[in-house]
Amino acid sequence: MTYDEINIGDILIASPGDKAYRYKVTRKNDHSHSVTVHTVEEYDANLQRHVPCICNVYTVLPENFCRKIQKRAVVL
């Protein structure tokens, strides 16, 4: 998977061996061709509580993901 194939709001599956498997893309970093992601479960829980701070945010290279499973209609 390349940087250009990923869009904000996409849900990605991490490579085998990671503790959390589903991640939502929240930002694309053009300077480093990396994406900022967070775990889907934590984001959904914080959204329901209207908590502005998202825990477990990672900046990762797209090559670390094996596939994109769906795209959310809402762009964050």
Model regions: which residues?
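Short alpha-helix capping/helix-loop boundary micro-motifs
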Residues: 1-2
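Intrinsically disordered, low-complexity, charged/polar segments
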Residues: 43-76
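Basic/aromatic-rich interaction segments and small domains that mediate binding to polyanionic partners
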Residues: 15, 19-54
